[in-house]
Amino acid sequence: MTKETKKRIKQRNKLWRVQKNYSSDINYGRYKKVRNEVTELVRRDQDNYRKRLLKSFKGHDKRFYGYIRSLQTRPAGVQQLVDGNGKITETDGEAAELLSKCFQEVYTQEDKKEECPQQWSGKRQRAGEISEEDIDITPEVVERALLRLKEDKSPGPDDLHPMLLRKCASAMAIPLSKIYNKSLNTGTVPKEWKLANVTPLFKKGKKSDPANYRPVSLTSVVCKVMESLVKSKLVEHLEKTGKLSSSQHGFTTGRYCLTNLLEAFENWTTALDEGWGVDVLFLDYRKAFDTVSHSKLMKKLHGCGIVGKLWEWIKDFLTLRKSRVGVRGSFSFWREVLSGVPQGSVLGPLLFLIFVNDLPEWIKSSLKMFADDTKIWARIRVEKDGECLQRDLDSLGRWSDEWLLRFNCEKCKVM
């Protein structure tokens, strides 16, 4: 708001007090004139502010979409829920417990016979592999990571707030670097780092149905800092070795939802201009992040050249995790997390990308992915072209069965 606008607002308020105490047509006319001027000035200042704000979002898609969401009406929190027997929850504690049980039901049951070979945790011996030896966690690196923490974020179950860690970055850097190095070199993660407070976020549908909520984990900020250090080295390794598929646009540097759409749209319009038809299949996986098999993910991590104590550390990071659901300060009982990559963690999205990374190798049709959202398409001129697309869909079905990531048929569409 400009100084001119603030000055006119004070004048408007003064004229209103005069009109209130000495009511007359003249006084009201003076007040009305300034009031209308203030309305125009405020509208002008708001427009200018939005223009400056939108200009600052250039190249920052995440901030832009966050701003758009902030303008929309925020959905209410968890309401009264109804369980499978038609019973309505009466307290926040009951709602938290019901949601916790609902989240537990989607987990993938691991095959006890499917064990990862012990030698995978051995030291790095070949080029194209990465182990704990490639990650040097110095006090300087830790301090820089602590200073990047956002103070407005929430803490995990340990109640160590990011504001505290950021303010004490210089003092915490040395002890934390020692803890991080010991954790990495032993391939173990402290059990306190594997706890999560889960916030249920409503998606769509009936708010009384617990199945219409998704879990987002609030985990230890201390652990998140270490995750960020490990993640940066993993991304560097994957980019250097060319392991990540170019079809993936989710959570990757220089690729976004927009690049995904533009590349697909250009391909489709080019085909149409050349006289082809285009059949597109939009695919979605059911509870994708929560149903990732840990043992199968560890196999894929090894396939990407992740070995040694680093491989063990990620394995320990994923296993024996526990979570509890919170609803307005009331919590459910702690329950073990049997599968999935924790939503809300730093490493989770990257681990999921690695899990679905080989998907394009199973088909011949064109494909684009944004995390778990997948679309495949083919140029159609004769019947056989459609048959090829169907064979690719069947192949993806076999991939789904092998890796235990099931299709959400309700969200799969054909265009």
Predicted regions mapped to residue ranges:
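Surface-exposed loop/turn segments and immediately adjacent short secondary-structure elements
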Residues: 4, 62-212, 217, 225, ...
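Short amphipathic alpha-helical coiled-coil/interface segments
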Residues: 5-13, 28-46, 61, 103, ...
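Mobile genetic element proteins and their domesticated derivatives, centered on retroelements
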Residues: 12, 38, 68, 103, ...
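Active-site-proximal segment of RNA-dependent polymerases
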Residues: 111-142, 188, 193-197, 236-291, ...
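Conserved catalytic palm subdomain of right-hand nucleotidyl-transferase polymerases, strongest
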Residues: 152-160, 209-218, 259-302
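Active-site palm subdomain of RNA-directed nucleic acid polymerases
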Residues: 230-248, 349-377
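Catalytic palm subdomain of template-directed nucleic-acid polymerases
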Residues: 288-304, 374-401
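Short, conserved micro-motifs composed of acidic
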Residues: 329, 391, 405-415
